[in-house]
Amino acid sequence: MDIFNAIILGIIEGITEFLPISSTGHIIVAAQWLGIEATATNQAFGVIIQLAAILAVLANYKDKFTPKHLNLWIKVAIAFIPLGIIAFIFSDVIKALFNVPVVGVMFIVGGVIFLLLERNYKEQNCTTTDVTQVTYKQAIWIGIAQVFALIPGTSRAGSSIVGAMLCGLNRKASAEFSFLLGLPVLAAASGYDLLKHYDLFTFDDLTALAVGFVTSFIVAYFTIKLFIRFLENFTFVSFGIYRIVFGVILLTIAYV
């Protein structure tokens, strides 16, 4: 992994991890276009820049890490359980789906879902306008919705946001619960991969790792802030359109 590729992947991870456009899908495509081989070391690099994105959430929502918000974190933990169980049981099946055609199709499917959701969504009818108001029942349904993110190209953020909106959360609360839910999900996935591949890195890899980590953290930190501001004035329609267009481009490249 050279410095240039580390910066590019760090930027992509930072932008896409918490937006409903599938960070995994973008990383897979970018790696192929950059000619980065799917070696264990390069896959472990992906884990490192993902950890940076996790820290960006911690930095943005440090006020939520207090005893008075314990109830919120219990709900986050409950929402994590469905994905954790399914990912553990079907990990080999999931890995077999990591290819451009699957990513392209799921980009389109996710885009259509967002367009259909926004067509009938009325924010003034939402029962939950703050992330701390999420109920246990809502947390369970959001967790079930997040399971679909195991299909590459679906987007963890996208599936959890859709689930949250369908459960009565407004757009901002949906996005923020998705951010917080990303902490145990990404920490579990990253921790597991690091335990498997920690011995693969050499001293020569440290510079690229550091550059990718810092890049991902900075970009993710500001992406989260800008995304929340965006949702105060706009809908997810633009993300739905982007997903469909990007998915069509991927399938065209894959089959033409």
UniProtKB/Swiss-Prot annotation:
- Transmembrane spans: 1-21, 38-58, 70-90, 97-117, 134-154, 175-195, 208-228, 236-256
Entry's EC annotation: 3.6.1.27
Which leading EC class covers this enzyme? hydrolase
Q: Which InterPro entries match?
A: UppP (IPR003824)
Chief location: membrane
Q: List the disulfide bonds.
A: none
Gene Ontology process terms (BP): cell wall organization; peptidoglycan biosynthetic process; regulation of cell shape; response to antibiotic
Task: List, alphabetically, the GO terms of the cellular component aspect.
Answer: plasma membrane
Which keywords has UniProt assigned to this entry? Antibiotic resistance, Cell inner membrane, Cell membrane, Cell shape, Cell wall biogenesis/degradation, Hydrolase, Membrane, Peptidoglycan synthesis, Transmembrane, Transmembrane helix
Subcellular location, record wording? Cell inner membrane
Domain of life here? Bacteria
Catalytic activity annotation = di-trans,octa-cis-undecaprenyl diphosphate + H2O = di-trans,octa-cis-undecaprenyl phosphate + phosphate + H(+)
**Record-level Gene Ontology MF annotations:** undecaprenyl-diphosphatase activity
Membrane topology (UniProt): Multi-pass membrane protein
- Does this UniProt record's set of keywords contain Cell inner membrane? yes
Instruction: Spell out the family assignment given in the record's similarity comment.
Output: Belongs to the UppP family.
- PANTHER family per the record? UNDECAPRENYL-DIPHOSPHATASE
- Role this protein plays: Catalyzes the dephosphorylation of undecaprenyl diphosphate (UPP). Confers resistance to bacitracin.
State any further remark.
Bacitracin is thought to be involved in the inhibition of peptidoglycan synthesis by sequestering undecaprenyl diphosphate, thereby reducing the pool of lipid carrier available.
Q: What is this protein called?
A: Undecaprenyl-diphosphatase 2
Q: Which organism does this sequence originate in? A: Pseudoalteromonas translucida (strain TAC 125)
- Report the gene name: uppP2
